[in-house]
Amino acid sequence: MMKRVHVYVKGKVQGVFFRAHTRKAALRFHVNGWVRNLPNGRVEAVFEGRSPEVNALIDWCRQGPSHAIVEHLDVCEETYTGEFDDFRILYDERAS
């Protein structure tokens, strides 16, 4: 079963290479989508892939890389679209 989630990560998640490590984890789990920093200090991401792999990436985000401190993780399931063929780091607020 395919799955899509929209994720917001709160805590010490900027300046600790959270986006780069999320991309590496997504590639390892064969999950597509994107990740970006938000001006309010959170990290936002969209993950698409097979349900077990997306769930594994969500679990990874609960901990994050070694220097991150994840205080809260919001996960919202969305309708799977299959629109992504890779996993990207976005560097502005446009997710298109």
Swiss-Prot record:
Record keyword Coiled coil present: no
Enzyme nomenclature, EC number: 3.6.1.7
Domain Acylphosphatase-like: 4-91
Segments passing through the bilayer: none
GO MF term set: acylphosphatase activity
Catalytic activity: an acyl phosphate + H2O = a carboxylate + phosphate + H(+)
Active-site residues annotated for this sequence: 19, 37
InterPro entries, A to Z: Acylphosphatase, Acylphosphatase-like_dom, Acylphosphatase-like_dom_sf, Acylphosphatase_CS
Alphabetical list of Pfam families matching this protein: Acylphosphatase (PF00708)
Entry keyword set: Hydrolase
Family designation: Belongs to the acylphosphatase family.
PANTHER family on file: ACYLPHOSPHATASE
NCBIfam families linked: PRK14438.1, PRK14444.1
Annotated protein name in UniProt: Acylphosphatase
